[in-house]
Structures are given as structure tokens and as C-alpha cells.
């Protein structure tokens, strides 16, 4: 049975633009982006290299601010948030998964997963218990004390997913999460995202691979910094 999408709006971008400057010359990267994402959607963001995918993801993830336009997250205007409030929003509402894993190499899998909870004021004993449960849920209960260098790419990405989930964010943002993985690990990681979608998480996935994007139920295609297509249902 197909999962019914929820209708509650979690993200609304209105006339978003982003430019960088080389000297005095403006270089537009995103232009007139209008996008609404509802709670519980699984959205892929696709497009050729240089289309603005990662820039858009950075804005959605509150890692960067747009040059113009409005971004509302859970109904709150992001531009009105100061740096501290923005950091809190990132830590509590959004879980990030990156292509390069972004694990701290001198920390064990367990300690990497614990890290976001330190900023969330979770008691030390509870941190460890929650992190162990989360690692077990992604099939890495027996790798908790391994260092990143002692794990495969697929295992490291599953640690990164566990870390992204540890504060129970409503939104998961994944930027090319399978880019460094073989086909077997790609399937394992994408099945985790599918499970999270079925559990009601909102997932936003940047990818250039059609077989990875096929796990999503909606596909936003970027071209030259603007949305050229917004496809609901399978990719044609």
C-alpha cells in the first residue's frame, strides 16, 4: 500500500535567490526559487553539475542564507533568526547526511553519534544509551567502538545516518549520500532512507543518480539555478 503524504507544510521558499561576487561582479547561482515541501514527503533534488543543487541544500539546511527572498521553516521566517537560534534549529529540527560522511576520525562510531546530543543538553548516561540503540537500529551495534578508519564506506555512512537521527529531527537532508559507495552499500543506505520515510520523516535528497532518486516520491529538477521541473511520482 502506498504511503499517504501528509499535507502540513514544513518548508516554503518564495522568490529565493543566491549570488556570489567575484570582485564587483555578481554571479547568480539560484534565481527565483519557489518551493513548498510538506511534512512526510521524500523529495529528490536533481540537476547537472553547477545547477545549484548543493547551494539550495545549504539554504534549506540553514547552513547558508539566501541573498534575497523568503524561507519559512515550520512557519518561522529563517531570516529573523540570529546565529544562536539558527544553530539550535539546525541541531534540533534537521539531521544532515553528507557524501564525505563528515565523521570525526579520532572519535569512535559511538562518540560520533553522541556528539549532537552534547549540544542538546542530554545527560551523559542517556547519551550513551541512546547512541547505542541508534547504532543498533542501523545494523552497527557491533561496531560501536570502531574508529571510522576501521569501517567500510557503507558502515561510515550508516554511522552518519545514526548521528543525523539521534536528536529525532523531523527533517533529514542528504547531499549525495551514496556518492562514495558501491552498489551494495548504496542499496543498504537507501533502504534506511525508505524506512525513515515510511516512519514519517521528511527527507530531502540531493543526487545525480536516477536509481537513487527513484526511492523518492517527488523530484525537483534544477537547471541553471532555477527549478525546471517538479515531478510528483516516478521519474519518466
Task: Label every model-predicted segment.
Residues 1-19, 229-236:
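ABC-family P-loop ATPase nucleotide-binding domain
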Residues 9-222:
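ABC family nucleotide-binding domain
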Residues 219-231:
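H-loop (His-switch) and adjacent beta-strand-loop-beta switch element
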